[in-house]
């Protein structure tokens, strides 16, 4: 990467995820160029998405359905919703310091005034109802064995536990 002053840097974050193939790999540029010639916004799923969905299902025998999202925020929002619908439970557990998007349910973080072994949550901005961090999210301490105790304690109300194994963008 090169900034406006001509300084060069190594992108050790891979663009926080989406650049796992590097910055501007020729094969990706060519694929984008080829697709643009066919169109770039269709509004409804097309043959390419159906083909990719089948490839993903074949690669993972337990996968029954595939849903494509246009952002990580949208993906986690639907994952939270699906987990709540499937389990009938309401609470989602997140690890302190992780980033899972900009929707109401992901805009929570540990309250720094709370006990690290059992962090309480607060929102990261205006407009998120108080009920979200207080009743719908469980903040877990990252790299702390007390997280397991909290998961066991709240297991009857947990719809899911979201794990970001390598924290990178928060």
Q: Could you say what each language-model-derived stretch is?
A:
Residues 3-4:
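Short, acidic, Ser/Thr-enriched surface-loop or helix-capping motifs
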Residues 8-89:
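Glycine-rich loop-to-alpha-helix module at the N-terminal edge of alpha/beta enzyme cores
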Residues 10, 95, 163:
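Active-site flanking residues adjacent to catalytic metal/cofactor-binding acidic residues
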Residues 15, 98, 166:
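Active-site pre-Tyr helix/loop in NAD(P)-dependent dehydrogenases
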Residues 41, 153-157, 167:
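Alpha-helical structural elements of signaling/regulatory helical domains
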Residues 54-160:
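PLP-dependent aspartate aminotransferase-fold enzymes
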Residues 164-170:
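Conserved PLP phosphate-binding loop immediately N-terminal to the Schiff-base lysine helix
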């Amino acid at each position: 990467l090169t900034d406006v002053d001509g300084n060069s840097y190594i992108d050790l974050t891979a663009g926080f995820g989406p650049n796992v193939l590097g910055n501007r790999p020729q094969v990706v540029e060519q694929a984008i160029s080829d697709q643009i010639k066919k169109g770039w916004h269709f509004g409804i799923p097309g043959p390419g998405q159906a083909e990719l969905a089948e490839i993903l299902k074949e690669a993972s025998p337990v996968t029954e359905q595939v849903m494509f999202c246009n952002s990580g925020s949208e993906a986690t929002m639907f994952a939270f919703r699906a987990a709540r619908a499937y389990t009938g439970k309401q609470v989602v557990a997140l690890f302190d310091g992780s980033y899972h998007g900009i929707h109401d349910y992901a805009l929570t973080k540990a309250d720094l005034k709370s006990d690290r072994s059992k962090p309480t949550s607060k929102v990261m901005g205006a407009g998120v109802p108080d009920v979200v961090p207080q009743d719908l999210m469980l903040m877990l301490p990252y790299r702390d064995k007390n997280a397991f105790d909290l998961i066991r304690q709240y297991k009857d109300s947990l719809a899911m536990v979201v794990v970001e194994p390598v924290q990178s963008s928060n």
